[in-house]
Amino acid sequence: MPRDAGRHGERQVRPARLRRFYEKTCDSGTVRTAYRCRAYPDEQQQAMLRRTFGCVRVVWNRTLAQRRARWHLERTGTSYAETDRALTAMKKDPDLAFLNQVSSVPLQQALRHQHQAFRGFFAGRARYPRFKSRAGRQSAHYTRSAFSLRGGVLRLAKAASPLRFTWTWPDIDVTALDPAMVIVSLESDGRWYVTFTVDTQAPEPLPQTGRAVGVDLGVKDFAVTSDGQRIANPRHLERRAQNLARYQRRLARCQNGSANRAKAKAKVARAHRKVRNVRQDFLHRASTRLVRENDIIVIEDLHVAGMVRNRRLARAISDCGWGEFRRQLEYKCQRYGRELVVIDRWYPSSKTCSACGHLLAELSLSTRHWTCPSCRARHDRDINAAQNIRAAGRAVARDAPGDACGGDVRHSGSSRVQSPANQEPQPARAGIPVFQGGE
């Protein structure tokens, strides 16, 4: 399917939709929060949930195949209503009678998610939707009509007994929880999780500090701030690379389809999970500290997908988690009344003297310190870049003050090339997502 098809129509309506969404979010004073905790289904529940996962995959893959075939044959799209009618026809098919053995809600949600995925694709925010495999993470989404949570006891549709889970938030009363959606998932390492999506009261904005900070992200140091602080790069994957490689070699030696291969695959998945967890913890600590200590946070719109094409730096860049760090800054600034400004990726922050504004013609990546030929000021490359980022961000914030919801950023898909002569780029600005959690 061509990437440009329908994109202009989506772009015309998307700003209005975003504006209505964030106005509603701010006016209502609520934010959507996801609480993810371990689940412990018994054997009967596991069998029921695995059947549900399989039915979700069948519905998703068949619907996606029908969308692709219709586009290639007729050059027309497929609406959600048409996929809903197709699901009804699937349930009447004798070969697909097993679809009636599970709750219909996860199947309907699969259609909704696919419809949203195509909207994101046509708007240029996501890749083309792919077919689902039984080898990856599995999940089923239940809305209010398909579950009940009373007194901390969770019951799912088509389940004969309550689903046992461990609540890990002692300051939140699970018996008073009123989730809008429950997501049951099975990770590749064999762990079960249940996620409660709840609309909660928005927290009070943090007290003003009067501080603004520019953040220069890198590989040698994860981040350098405009006030000279350096956040060391812990290199989580590199520290555990030997252990992970050992498990991967064992997996490669196992025969396909064997029980030993399944065990080895689970060990590889567990090793990846440990790396992912420590990275998430580090990013949360770093982002929370910046949000607490500063009113305005300025970062660059890094093109991570393009940067990882460098084979020598791809693993190190991916290990940093810059995209996840930005996502956390976005929703935390939104929630706690801070302002996040994202300046253009082409802004020459490293080559510009933060003292006099002189712009160097060239500056190699290996040059970590340099002297300005105009004012003779001596610069640390990263600190100078962070100071220029802060100056550009404060100019943007001054010219386009944030809305009542807190942070303002430009959406990652709308960067514009700035001339090096324009040292204060004016990026387009959009709202910040308020969703939290890994689901």
Please tell me what each predicted stretch does.
Residues 147, 152-155, 191-194, 222-223, ...:
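Hydrophobic residues embedded in beta-strands of well-ordered beta-sheets
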Residues 153-164, 196-201, 228-229, 374-376:
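Secondary-structure transition/turn motif
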Residues 2-28, 32, 316, 320-439:
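Positively charged, low-complexity nucleic-acid-binding target-recognition regions
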Residues 2-106:
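Gly/serine-rich nucleotide phosphate-binding loop at the start of the catalytic core
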Residues 80-187:
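Acidic carboxylate diad motif detector
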Residues 150, 187-189, 226-229, 355-356, ...:
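Short acidic-glycine loop/turn motifs at beta-strand connectors
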Residues 65, 69-96, 100, 177-181, ...:
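Substrate-contacting helices/loops that form the catalytic groove of nucleic-acid
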